[in-house]
Amino acid sequence: MNEDLMKHLAPRPGRYPLLPELSPRAEVALICRMLFHEGYDDHIAGHITVLQPDGTLLVNPWELAWDEITAADVLRVDAAGKVLEGEWNVTPAIGLHLAVHAARDDVKVIVHNHSRFGTLWANAKRVPPVYDQTSAQVDGDIAVFDEYGGTVDDAAESNAAVAALGDRKWALLANHGVFVVANDLRQAHLRCLTLEWRCRQAWHMEALGAGHPMPQAVADRTGAMIDGNGFPFLFEAMARREIRLDPSVLEG
């Protein structure tokens, strides 16, 4: 978030803090639930990794659906994926995450799932057009990785996916799902919901058989501004919703 810009745009303190103080594990549990309600809801599939200052990673457990995870359930693993803290197990498909974290110093958060509309476009091996402002909240090309062999726990396949991603923010994994990287949790949340919204809106527009994509220059300018500066208060609002729905998300 661009703090200097926020001081100018939102100088008033508000009536109360937007969120309670959250532990890193609580933030992971919250984003799991937030994204579940944005369409990242393929049962127990999908994984989120968050790089910590000591080089370890926080990751959701293999056994649990994203909408039931609490802070106490979140695992800590080392750079090789070995569980250091936690009572659950880590998915064997964590290899792609580990490879990207190792290859890119700018990536602190990685999200992978088989989102409802993102996976449709991944199956079509097509990048969805941008039709509206919300779809344009994030700029940059979407990579399409078209070498899926049925798993991403193979080192060679993970390395190929890393190469296909390059320095991009997101990718469609053909016949599989979506893959999003970010510098922090708030940016990851914005990028994930923007990708799924964009995929959903484009699907509906194609079903309608009408509509005109946003001019590329306008989409690029919009995305550079919003993704570059952050979307004020969005993460906090969606996190509060999850806490209202189930305060136990913060337990642990």
Spans of model-derived segments:
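Glycine-rich flexible loops
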Residues: 1-252
